[in-house]
Amino acid sequence: MKVLIVGGGGREHAIAQSVAKSEKVDKIYCTPGNAGIAALAECAPIGAMEFDKIVAFAKEKEVDLVIVGMDDPLVGGLVDELEKAGIRAFGPKKNAAILEGSKAFSKDLMKKYNIPTAAYENFTDPDAAIKYLETEAKFSNCIKSRWTGSWERSFDLQYTGGSKRWCQRDYDG
């Protein structure tokens, strides 16, 4: 079996190590990969968000299974595109990946269905977030960015000044 892993971080390296142990796997590809993954797989310089190129590469190499490890291509719908092209893929489709891709969506869903979760608030305005921190927040704050990315943007801020600076920076982009 030929396997393509999409991503180039530690998660994808761990996936490549596990896949390499299978006697059923003859060849591993990775896009874009990294130096560590290159010891286990043939890496191709295709970005994780270049869906058309990933689909074409998978077809060209006659890949049997694509494993999508990174959040951004999952949230963007790569699994949907692969399946549309008749390529087997492991990972959630776009409509399910939003659970990982949007902390606000996930928290709102948990609240709606009474699923236990830590207290939270969602803000789209930095001034409203800062006002909440100054008047309502009673404990140290864990602030999560609204963006997915190659690394999780989450900060445990012990004092309001740091929380306010982080909010302003995140909203400024």
Which ranges hold each PLM region?
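ATP-binding N-terminal substructure of ATP-dependent carboxylate-amine bond-forming enzymes
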Residues: 1-94
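ATP-grasp fold ATP-binding core
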Residues: 110, 134-157, 173
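Residue-level detector of structured alpha->beta connecting loops
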Residues: 62, 86, 114, 137-138
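Short beta-strand-to-turn element immediately C-terminal to the catalytic PLP-Schiff-base lysine
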Residues: 7, 123, 155-159
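Conserved ATP-binding module of the ATP-grasp superfamily
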Residues: 65, 116-119, 138-142, 158-173
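Acidic/polar helix N-cap motif
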Residues: 47-50, 102, 125-126, 159
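Short, glycine-/small-residue-rich phosphate/pyrophosphate-handling segment
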Residues: 101-132
